[in-house]
Design a protein with these regions (language model features):
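Juxtamembrane extramembrane loops of integral membrane proteins
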Residues: 1-155, 159-162, 180
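Acidic, S/T/G-rich, low-cysteine, solvent-exposed domains in lumenal/extracellular/periplasmic regions
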Residues: 79, 90, 106-362
Length: 362
């Protein structure tokens, strides 16, 4: 049996805050009069000894109006409740290997992402360091995981490491790649006012090419972009800040072509690279795509913060939609087929079992 309890938040706001059910402000316009109301858009599911809080108000981008946010939240209600029920009713069954050793993001940088994943899956750190001395053992250990997460590596992969990941994929393991193919960081730009954006060599171009995609070493600028906050002067001893559109940070609306990306709000990407698709037997589904108002910037190239003051010329933002996130599905052909592999496996494959790969170029 399912029991429903509706609570007036005004009667016990302090207790709700202690549970993490934070209120939101809603602007209401009635008969020309604008007022502000405080709402607590949350639901709590309790099952056996477990409790799951469900946010009913979807997060929005800077360019999303309140009306659009509310409409998106209403459309997302069914998904929110189903997701909450799955978290609390079904036990964790699958596991994710969080790869380290190639300069990936550290735990602090991945904290929010991994915290959310940890509600659904078992997580474990995994390094490919031992692949040069014990490749078969490394692959066997990696095969214990259902998915390998590679988050922003900055050190090139060796052929031995690539071969292990290749065979892992062909044996049915799934992979999620979050790749920065261009070195361009806002921190150094904020200090100096400019920065040299240059290509990052991860030794993966041939790897992905054999699977049917090419991640370019460029940056996609988009007129549909997020804003960055910059200091514009001082008032007394107080620094003034102002928000500026920053076309190197596209605001991407995920496609509804696959359940992975359906009903997601706008996603901010930073200095993403365009992904090209190549003809082969692998099924490809675009998950993240820019608007049609884009300009591709090749690398190496200087990026200057003063560009925020320049009005964009629509005539040069005409390079069309660019793929920034993609899902590959099917029976992959080994990236080492018809090549001499760095070592031999007892169960080496050239054609794989059905598997999946997601690549996001940020």
């Amino acid at each position: 049996n399912i029991s429903f309890v509706f609570v007036n938040p005004e009667k016990d706001m302090q207790r709700l805050l202690q549970k993490g059910l934070t209120p939101s402000r809603l602007t209401v316009k009635k008969k020309g009069v604008v007022s502000e109301s405080v709402i607590v858009p949350w639901a709590t599911i309790q099952y056996q000894n477990k409790i799951e809080n469900i946010s009913l108000l979807k997060e929005s981008s800077q360019t999303t109006s309140q009306e659009e946010q509310l409409l998106n939240s209403i459309q997302n209600l069914e998904f929110s409740f189903i997701d909450g029920l799955k978290k609390i009713v079904f036990p964790k069954k699958k596991s994710i290997a969080v790869l380290t050793g190639n300069g990936e993001l550290d735990d602090l940088q991945l904290y929010s992402f991994l915290k959310d994943l940890g509600r659904h899956y078992h997580l474990g750190k995994f390094t490919l360091d031992s692949v040069s001395t014990a490749p078969q053992k490394t692959l066997n250990q990696l095969d214990n995981y259902d998915l390998a997460l590679v988050a922003k590596p900055s050190i090139a992969f060796s052929e031995q490491e690539k071969f292990v990941l290749d065979q892992y994929l062909l044996q049915g393991g799934k992979t999620l790649w979050l790749l920065d193919h261009v070195v361009a960081e806002m921190d150094s730009m904020s200090q100096k006012g400019s920065s040299l954006a240059f290509s990052r060599n991860l030794n993966l171009d041939d790897f992905f090419f054999r699977y049917g995609i090419r991640v370019n070493h460029n940056m996609v600028k988009d007129l549909y972009a997020a804003k960055i906050s910059l200091a514009t002067g001082n008032t007394g001893n107080r620094t003034n800040y102002e928000n500026f559109l920053w076309y190197y940070h596209p605001l991407v609306t995920p496609s509804n072509r696959h359940p992975v990306s359906i009903n997601l709000g706008s996603i901010k990407l930073q200095f993403p690279s365009a992904i090209d698709t190549l003809a082969n037997a692998i099924q490809k589904t675009i998950l993240l795509e820019s608007s049609s108002l884009t300009k591709v910037v090749e690398t190496p190239n200087f990026i200057e913060l003063k560009a925020v003051n320049e009005l964009p010329d629509p005539k040069i933002f005409r390079q069309g939609k660019k793929t920034l996130g993609i899902l590959l599905e099917g029976n992959f052909t080994s990236a080492y087929k018809d090549r001499v592999p760095p070592f031999e496996f007892s169960d080496k494959r050239e054609t794989g079992l059905p598997s999946k790969m997601i690549l996001i170029s940020d």
